[in-house]
Amino acid sequence: MRRCRWSAGESGNRKRLTVTGKIKKKEREEAMETETTGENSRIMEKQRAFFESGKTFDLAFRRAALVRLERAVAAHEKEICEALYQDLGKSETEGYMCEVGLTLGEIREMRKKLRRWSRTKRVGAGLANFPAKGYIVQEPYGVALIMSPWNYPFMLTIEPLAGAIAAGNCCVIKPSAYSPATSAVIARLIREIFPEGYVTVIEGGRKENAELLEQKFDYIFFTGSVSVGKLVMQKAAAHLTPVSLELGGKSPCIVDRTAKISLAARRIVFGKFLNCGQTCVAPDYVLVEECVKDEFLKELIRWTKKMYGSALENPDYGRIVNRKHFERIKGLIDSRHLVWGGEVKEETLQIAPAILYPVSETDACMQEEIFGPILPVLPVKNMEEARAFVKSRPHPLACYVFTASKKTERMFLKETAFGGGCVNDTIMHLTPSGLPFGGVGSSGMGAYHGKKSFETFSHAKSVLKKSTLLDVTARYQPYTGWKRRLIRAIGNR
């Protein structure tokens, strides 16, 4: 490539302008991009070859892989918890309770029930096909991409991976760049137990995400923001790749006059301020009946004090993931409505639990998912007003109702759309492996956990096996009178 140099004459005032350095920089960037693209293509080729070898179709192979994964997670527990502390300030107790322990339970569930879930299911073939047998065969998609977030960086990476392995897929894992310590531990752990062609980890940021999404995967499982989820779906559409999108939204919490107010406040405080509010299913705001609002606020503050004390000095209270999110969350604390907490510690990126009241739907904290330790409380006259408020907004990932009234319970469970939730608790619906977890509408699509994870990463292949001993001629032309009568008689059976 020809190098160019422009310069002014001796009497000119223009400074010398060289483009040589710019050209070299561009050449280096293009070379690196080509190298990365080539590396991704090489990994995809290895994964395709591994899948085509048929090894992952063997249930014994899958079960052995789950055993290795379970043992590796247990063996690296301390290292994982240390990484979670580096990335998010999570205490060892919270790291185990919310990430390592739940992950081990999920892997164990899959290991024990894999054979049962994988069985070919017999279904009726209908009178029109007599004699015949119908089957549903679960088969893996092929090569799956798992893109995980930073807020629960270990659990939200390894739990989907376990489902993909159980279903017989090969996997490329892309952890979040915002949790580098945990991403590094995951990469080392995976390299220790699996060959690159079977499961591999690609670390990096947006550039690596974009390059991976150009590849043709057989399934994409994404957990993250709505905006990035839309981009993932757009890229997947180019290859008609099926996707699961685990997104977010403003999850409401409703407290009516019949609720046990103190217990409701305690459980809301737990679900909201766990992981500094950086939980996709955390209660985003509370709608409380006016007749119990004073008692509720009193109990809310009491339990926040009791559970967290001086939060910024509490070793079990973490921090905000990075400066960008810290500044965003800090900007949502409106001093006009602050009734408790909200202290900040700039050097450690910590924000103490903040309770805002009274809040209206036009306030800044109600315009976006908070994803931080701020709890807005909005008074409502009755449950009909609360229901109308929830229904007027995009479908949330979760919804929580505190009530002793069957009428209120039925109202919210049957008349409002949300991904999942609890009656008289918060966030705990994530813990049973028998309950699928996922969103609806703008909060996501698809679900996982337990058997649902296996089904998510499996294609249900329908097979009809027909007998050759008998061939009913009524379906063949020409359609005479008796054939038409017979078709009408058995056509809907």
Residue ranges with predicted function:
Residues T34, F194, S227-E361, V423, ...:
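ALDH superfamily catalytic-core signature
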Residues K55, E70-V73, E77, L88, ...:
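Structural signal for hydrophobic packing residues in well-ordered secondary-structure cores
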Residues I254, K305, I351-R493:
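Conserved C-terminal structural/oligomerization subdomain of aldehyde/semialdehyde dehydrogenase
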Residues R62, I107, G168, V199, ...:
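Residue-level signal for inorganic ion chemistry
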Residues A49-K55, I146, C253-V255, Y285-E290, ...:
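Short, well-ordered beta-strand elements within core beta-sheets of diverse protein domains
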Residues K22, E30-Y135:
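N-terminal Rossmann-like NAD(P)+-binding subdomain of aldehyde/semialdehyde dehydrogenases
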Residues R3-E27:
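Conserved C-terminal "lid"/linker of ANL adenylate-forming enzymes
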Residues L127-L263:
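Rossmann-like NAD(P) dinucleotide-binding subdomain of oxidoreductase/dehydrogenase enzymes
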